[in-house]
Amino acid sequence: MKAIFYFGIILIVVVLALHLFAKGSDQNKQLANNKNQISMENNSGLQTEILKEGTGEKAEAGDTVTVHYTGYLEDGTKFDSSLDRGEPFSFNLGTGQVIEGWDRGVAGMKVGEKRKLIIPPEIGYGARGTPGGPIPPNATLIFEVELLKID
């Protein structure tokens, strides 16, 4: 009788271990798939996630790029959108015309690519925010940016 009891306990432990191993394996596969999509610049804290792959040439410093974007605060509040205005936004990449997080986050994008940029305050609007505007001091910003054109 004791042998059957111990055998039952061992069987339950083995089944639970196999279940947990299989679940962990699925999570590892999912993380491996996402690894190519999400990156973080260690020195700046910028996080990027590719939402849609692009094609063609990559945007480089000195290029004039045209994008559509929507900006959010961490709580999900939308504060700006070129899509809502129906007018794309163009700027010279890497020249400081935009916040540093944009210069870093848009660099390397391909035409047609859509990225999520998570920009810490240090490379966003910092401790000043946008006085009288929608971005509070020390805000982490989230942008969805689609690269439309490189000139």
Question: What are these model-predicted stretches?
Answer:
Residues 1-151:
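Cross-family detector of peptidyl-prolyl cis-trans isomerase
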